[in-house]
Curated annotation (Swiss-Prot):
InterPro entries, sorted: YqhG
The name this protein goes by in its record: Uncharacterized protein YqhG
Organism: Bacillus subtilis (strain 168)
One Pfam family linked to the record: YqhG
Origin organism lineage: Bacteria, Bacillati, Bacillota, Bacilli, Bacillales
Length: 264
């Protein structure tokens, strides 16, 4: 997940959860959290327990996130957030708690003419390449539910649109040619191909480490004709540790109705 994608994701997340963007610029943003969002991502259970017990006025945090150290102001005091950062995974967890799927419409001001909105299915997925080590890749896809076109970096491209949860006056949605369920199947196939196109050296290296450890294990027990239970348990543990596997998890997604097309 590139840092610009992290920035765009955070911006969309906080806007969707009614958090005020107090300030933002190249490589950073300052956000005034709501009470609920503070509770979900800031790890202050004792503070909120005390506030609720004493009846004091809630004081949710205002926090600055730095998404690009090179371009953010050098004297800016904030929390660097990147793919793999604990805070970002807390936010992913909050996304799941608050609802993984949404429906949004482009905000259109019309003088009275009817405006058609085209349907897009968008998802953000995490592809995990795992053995004794793990690498995660975030993929953001958009599927046009009329033409069947699939584009990447969909989350980033959405930032050019002003979105709202309510369809605007004089707007109407175009009926999709592809049902969302069928669309997800198409996207699953796309994700599978994308995952398999990644270099396989990580898996080959894991298998080599697995073989080396199995050689050591066999050598340790080579003088024992009938292998004890410990041998088989350790053998299974090595398989669990080293066997390469790829998993895909949908983090969030939704239906997006847009006036203009999105180029790939």
């Amino acid at each position: 997940m590139r840092q610009q994608e992290v920035h765009d994701f955070l911006l969309r997340f906080f806007q969707a959860n009614s958090c005020q963007i107090v300030d933002q610029g190249l490589g950073y943003m300052t956000v005034q959290l709501t009470v609920e969002m503070d509770k979900q991502i800031m790890n202050r259970p004792f503070y909120w327990h005390w506030r609720e017990k004493t009846g004091g006025d809630p004081n949710p945090m205002k926090i600055t996130f730095i998404t690009d150290k090179e371009n953010a102001p050098k004297d800016l005091d904030g929390e660097f957030i990147y793919f793999g950062a604990p805070r970002l995974f807390q936010i992913f967890k909050a996304v799941k708690q608050n609802g993984r799927f949404t429906r949004m419409y482009e905000k259109i001001e019309s003088a009275g003419a009817k405006v058609p909105l085209q349907p897009w299915l968008g998802i953000n997925v995490t592809i995990s390449y795992q053995s004794d080590m793990k690498k995660d890749k975030l993929l953001s896809l958009g599927l046009h539910l009329v033409s069947g076109t699939i584009i990447e970096d969909f989350q980033s491209k959405l930032t050019q649109f002003s979105l709202t949860s309510q369809i605007c006056d004089y707007c109407f949605t175009i009926s999709p040619m592809i049902k969302p369920e069928s669309g997800l199947k198409r996207m699953e196939n796309y994700i599978s191909k994308s995952a398999m196109q990644e270099p396989s050296d990580w898996a080959e290296q894991a298998v080599n480490r697995w073989k080396n450890d199995m050689t050591l294990l066999d050598k340790f027990y080579e003088h024992i004709e009938e292998k004890p239970e410990e041998y088989h348990l350790e053998k299974q543990a090595l398989k669990t540790l080293y066997q390469p596997k790829i998993s895909v998890e949908i983090e969030n997604g939704g239906l997006f109705y847009l006036q203009n097309n999105i180029s790939s």
